[in-house]
């Protein structure tokens, strides 16, 4: 998993509340068990005017020019600004996969659905919670300022606006440690690789009859 320490990124404003996981990545794209290939279909039903299908050539599909991610000024955005209860709906982990593969490193919103919130941390995506008032002000500034960027510092737990104002956010210490060091569940397990190998060797030596055919 890619570590997250500091990030300067262009902000895209998704001014909708209760964005669910089926809107983030529609159900027809969930057939793959790989963690890649979902970025091109992020917000598929909003980005395109037709109904998307797996393995389709998106370059030939009609774009919804009114959708924020299709606007020229938000191309290359890596910070998504959203409203309350982002990521609600079914518990598909494909949602943070799609957001991360598209290029987003962080989401800023007043609240998230619990399962999406947890899955984001496990996939290198930083979901930041700010107050409604702080989010409202960010929406106003982003929409009024082309090229609006934020500086996110995970170690300091701060979001710095272009005008210099610093917004503080809270994060669980364990999740912060994992993101700073790029540790997902597999990475955490591998940290104990020597201890696991020692246990297996001891177990094999003490009960060799269990491993005669191994």
Swiss-Prot record:
Keyword terms, alphabetized: Amino-acid biosynthesis, Branched-chain amino acid biosynthesis, Leucine biosynthesis, Lyase
EC number: 4.2.1.33
GO biological process: L-leucine biosynthetic process
Catalytic activity: (2R,3S)-3-isopropylmalate = (2S)-2-isopropylmalate
Gene Ontology MF term list: 3-isopropylmalate dehydratase activity
GO cellular component: 3-isopropylmalate dehydratase complex
Pathway: Amino-acid biosynthesis; L-leucine biosynthesis; L-leucine from 3-methyl-2-oxobutanoate: step 2/4
Name of the molecule in the record: 3-isopropylmalate dehydratase small subunit
Organism for this UniProt entry: Pseudomonas fluorescens (strain ATCC BAA-477 / NRRL B-23932 / Pf-5)
């Amino acid at each position: 998993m890619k570590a997250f320490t500091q990030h300067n990124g262009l902000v895209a404003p998704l001014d909708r509340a209760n964005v669910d996981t089926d809107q983030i990545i529609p159900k027809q794209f969930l057939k793959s068990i790989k963690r890649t290939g979902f970025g091109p279909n992020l917000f598929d039903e909003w980005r395109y005017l037709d109904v998307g299908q797996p393995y389709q050539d998106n370059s030939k599909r009609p774009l919804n020019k009114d959708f924020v991610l299709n606007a020229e000024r938000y191309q290359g955005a890596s910070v998504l600004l959203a409203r309350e209860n982002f990521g609600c709906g079914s518990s598909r982990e494909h949602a943070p996969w799609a957001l991360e593969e598209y290029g987003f490193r962080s989401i800023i919103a007043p609240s998230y659905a619990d399962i999406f919130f947890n899955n984001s941390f496990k996939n290198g995506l930083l979901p930041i919670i700010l107050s409604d008032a702080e989010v409202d002000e960010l929406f106003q500034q982003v929409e009024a300022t082309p090229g609006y960027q934020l500086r996110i510092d995970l170690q300091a737990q701060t979001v710095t606006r272009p005008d210099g104002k610093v917004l503080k956010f809270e994060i669980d210490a364990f999740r912060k440690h994992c993101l700073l060091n790029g540790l997902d569940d597999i990475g955490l397990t591998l940290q104990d690789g020597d201890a696991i190998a020692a246990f297996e060797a001891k177990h094999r030596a003490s009960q060799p009859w269990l491993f005669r055919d191994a």
